[in-house]
A protein has these predicted regions:
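A broad "ordered helical/assembly scaffold" signature
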Residues: 9-10, 126
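Conserved N-terminal alpha-helix of the aminotransferase class I/II PLP-enzyme fold
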Residues: 10-59, 84-92
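C-terminal substrate-binding/catalytic lobe of Rossmann-fold NAD(P)-dependent oxidoreductases
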Residues: 1-5, 12
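Conserved PLP-enzyme active-site core in the AAT-like
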Residues: 51-199
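Short conserved active-site loop signatures built around small residues
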Residues: 1, 37, 194
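Residue-level marker of positions within ordered structural domains that often coincide
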Residues: 7, 47, 197
Length: 199
């Protein structure tokens, strides 16, 4: 559906949709049948309950992190990250009073030492961009959830894609993607996805 708006059968139907008392499409920014179809496919590929499409991979990453933390919270992230993600975590989100610690996520002792009662998110990519370092998702998720099951383990699965790796099946809580890379495969689309578990 290459449209920004949708028709209604009646004025009353339009009013009900805008009021939120009837489900259906109103405007393509919040929902579009084509976007919903892609979201459903990505969620299925990742064994997730639902997915949200974004305008870019960084849109997916920042949306997920912004809704997961507030001032005073802490994020523990791997030290090897895509440059824009590292810049966001080290320079942008910290301006909102969020503390970010960077560690080698393969060092489980360092991970355990970095976790505090203020930690809300553990974030990493695997394989990492650009070094292709591989991180043991299950080992990280098990260590984090043993400390506090409410901490979100967020994995950027851009470089593996769900064809080779499904982080939710390995204990992660949320998966993010830059669809520009392997999901699209051609470098001619800019998009991102956030995929979550049933809970």
């Amino acid at each position: 559906y290459q449209t920004s708006t949708f028709m209604f059968e009646t004025v009353e139907q339009g009013g009900a949709r805008f009021a939120g008392t009837e489900t259906g499409y109103v405007y393509s920014r919040p929902a579009n049948p084509s976007t919903n179809a892609v979201e459903d496919k990505i969620a299925s590929l990742e064994n997730g309950e639902a997915a949200m499409a974004t305008a870019s991979g960084m849109g997916a990453i920042t949306a997920m992190l912004y809704c997961s933390v507030v001032a005073g919270d802490e994020i523990v992230a791997d030290e090897t990250l895509y440059g824009c993600t590292f810049a966001f975590l080290s320079k942008e989100i910290t301006q909102l009073g969020v503390k970010v610690s960077f560690i080698n996520m393969n060092n489980i002792d360092a991970l355990k030492a970095a976790l505090t009662d203020k930690t809300k998110v553990v974030y990493f990519e695997t394989p990492c961009n650009p070094t292709m370092k591989v991180i043991d998702i299950r080992a990280v998720a098990d260590a984090v959830h043993a400390f506090n099951k409410d901490i979100k383990v967020i994995v950027d699965n851009t470089f593996c894609s769900p064809y080779l790796q499904r982080p939710l099946d390995l204990g992660a809580d949320v998966v993010v993607h830059s669809a520009t890379k392997y999901i699209n495969g051609h470098g001619d689309v800019i998009a991102g996805f956030v995929v979550g578990k049933p809970e």
